[in-house]
Amino acid sequence: MHVTHLSLADFRSYARVEVPLDPGVTAFVGPNGQGKTNLVEAVGYLATLGSHRVSSDAPLVRMGAERAVIRAQVRQGERQQLIELELNPGRANRARVNRSSQVKPRDVLGIVRTVLFAPEDLALVKGDPGERRRFLDELITARSPRMAGVRSDYDRVLKQRNTLLKSAALARRHGGRTMDLSTLDVWDQHLARAGAELLAQRLDLIASVQPLADKAYEQLAPGGGPVALEYKPSAPGEAHTREDLYEQLMAALAEARKQEIERGVTLVGPHRDDLLLKLGSLPAKGYASHGESWSYALALRLASFDLLRAEGNEPVLVLDDVFAELDARRRERLAELVAPGEQVLVTAAVDDDVPHVLAGARFTVAEGTVERV
């Protein structure tokens, strides 16, 4: 799969831009702050319905504009599709596929798949658990787009349950009066049902990614491993099937109910879990060097690419200013590993930041213009 044409209107710094794209490597080169990342960010948005840089859509709309539009032509084998997303901050976004407006934004998931390498990837190893949960859930959705609905259901139920718990906590603090918590039982069931499906997918994903990540780390840093991925659930237990995970979550919610009412927040569930990344016998966070942490983060992304490619729809590889963060050895090894990709999009401040093995199409980016060299 590859993108053959990218069109942006009022997206980030671009009033309007048209970028023809070929299979193989394409590099966008120009000084920082000129809009290189905006181009690959738009491609990533088509794949995830979100940005790797900001948490809301508002910053994606050019200042003074009401909406932004991302449009892309995508080819998979002999099949071509036209995807369009209209970003409307404060209102519902809109989507079109092959000019049909009878689709929801979520329906475009799976048409474009990307694996993004970016400076922010270091947070996968050194950052908070939320970074690792996001890594798992975005990859789950790339494998199975319907999981976007499950994630949305879980977030909605979690919000409703937290509202009820917060009200109960406030009522208890003010005068000692109690609330009818019978509806909490219903929310527990909804939360456990969606949570169990999400957990089952996460556990299956980790089992698939583990050997691929270990192989990728060995390719990047020979003799430096092994690496191991270990899921750390907030609801204790060894369950793996969806049914057993449901029972495990229900038991954990019952056990935590008194404390949750006191604190006014849900304390167990996938939103509180973590992924432990081990290097050798030690956790990478806190023990791995800066270089080892980079190798680990890159290995996770390479494993994601290998997994999606093996499942039949090769993703677009996006390397956003990542080579400038790496030493010469890691830079060359990463370039050699991604070069065979069907489509590789690279951004760099200067030509020298793009390894020679990634020779291909070049665009210069400056002052809102994108020109092919």
Curated annotation (Swiss-Prot):
CDD domains: ABC_RecF
GO biological process: DNA replication; DNA synthesis involved in DNA repair; double-strand break repair; SOS response
InterPro entries: DNA-binding_RecF, DNA-binding_RecF_CS, P-loop_NTPase, RecF/RecN/SMC_N, RecF_2
UniProt superkingdom: Bacteria
UniProt-annotated binding residues for ATP: 30-37
Places the protein is found: Cytoplasm
Keywords: ATP-binding, Cytoplasm, DNA damage, DNA repair, DNA replication, DNA-binding, Nucleotide-binding, SOS response
Gene3D superfamilies linked: P-loop containing nucleotide triphosphate hydrolases, RecF/RecN/SMC, N-terminal domain
Single Gene Ontology MF annotation: ATP binding
Protein family according to the UniProt entry: Belongs to the RecF family.
NCBIfam families: recf
Entry-linked PANTHER family: DNA REPLICATION AND REPAIR PROTEIN RECF
Its job: The RecF protein is involved in DNA metabolism; it is required for DNA replication and normal SOS inducibility. RecF binds preferentially to single-stranded, linear DNA. It also seems to bind ATP.
Record-given protein name: DNA replication and repair protein RecF
Source organism of the structure: Streptomyces coelicolor (strain ATCC BAA-471 / A3(2) / M145)
Gene: recF
